[in-house]
């Protein structure tokens, strides 16, 4: 089973439900496209096309700074293997120039806010090293969703900062059911340092019928002893233009 993501504009949506009933949501629209293969490799092009929303509102305060700096990364051209492994940033010099210039502007604007300056400096260090930056991209939820169906059985999905910050869950999807238009996946086992009492998962993929997909949705519920249930929902859905 191998499928590429269908080119176009997509909405990326992320949501976390906590045991106390609180939730956190994040969404943004991006454009996704591929170049033709060259020696087996292709370039995945990701470009931002709309504003981000956090809990249904435009980013404020520190979130605004994170959004401001993060948006400068686009367009991002990533050379990938046939199985979806990121190999290099084709336009790395261009990306770094934009990112470092904007980072300096932000630090100058917020020079009296040491936490913001420290955050920007940390981000600059991460992006300056292409290998470290490439690793960060490869572990991002949005990238992992894009390339998941290129090698379902071979991909190990890493879900970071869940159920808590600096926690990480690693797992693989298996195909539970399939027909001409849909693919249903599940997660039989999760690897993590945190003890989970139970977990429930399901993923839905909509096929276009042309060896591509244009919608993927994943829901994971984990139970922690003494805490209760944490739910994570991720979705990447094409917008009809």
Segments (PLM) and residue ranges:
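Solvent-exposed helix/loop surface patches that form functional interfaces
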Residues: 87-184
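Acidic, serine/threonine-rich low-complexity disordered tracts
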Residues: 1-80, 144-241
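A glycine-biased structural micro-motif
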Residues: 66-81, 85, 92-97, 101-104
């Amino acid at each position: 089973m191998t499928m590429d993501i269908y080119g176009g504009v997509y909405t990326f949506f992320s949501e976390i439900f906590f045991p106390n009933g609180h939730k956190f949501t994040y969404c943004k629209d991006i454009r996704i496209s591929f170049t033709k293969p060259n020696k087996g490799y292709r370039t995945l092009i990701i470009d931002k096309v709309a504003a981000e929303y956090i809990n249904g509102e435009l980013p404020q305060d520190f979130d605004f700074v994170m959004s401001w700096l993060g948006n400068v990364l686009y367009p991002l051209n990533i050379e990938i293997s046939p199985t979806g492994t990121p190999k290099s940033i084709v336009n790395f010099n261009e990306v770094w120039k934009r990112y470092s210039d904007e980072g300096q502007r932000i630090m100058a604007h917020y020079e009296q806010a040491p936490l913001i300056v420290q955050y920007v400096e940390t981000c600059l260090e991460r992006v300056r090293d292409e290998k470290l930056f490439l690793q960060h991209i490869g572990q991002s939820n949005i990238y992992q969703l894009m390339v998941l169906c290129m090698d379902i059985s071979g991909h190990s999905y890493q879900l970071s900062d869940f159920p808590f910050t600096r926690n990480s869950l690693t797992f693989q999807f298996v195909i539970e059911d399939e027909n001409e238009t849909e693919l249903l996946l599940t997660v039989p086992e999760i690897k993590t340092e945190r003890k989970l009492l139970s977990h429930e998962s399901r993923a839905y993929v909509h096929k276009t019928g042309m060896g591509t997909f244009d919608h993927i949705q994943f829901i994971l519920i984990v139970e922690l002893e003494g805490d209760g249930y944490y739910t994570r929902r991720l979705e990447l859905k094409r917008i009809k233009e």
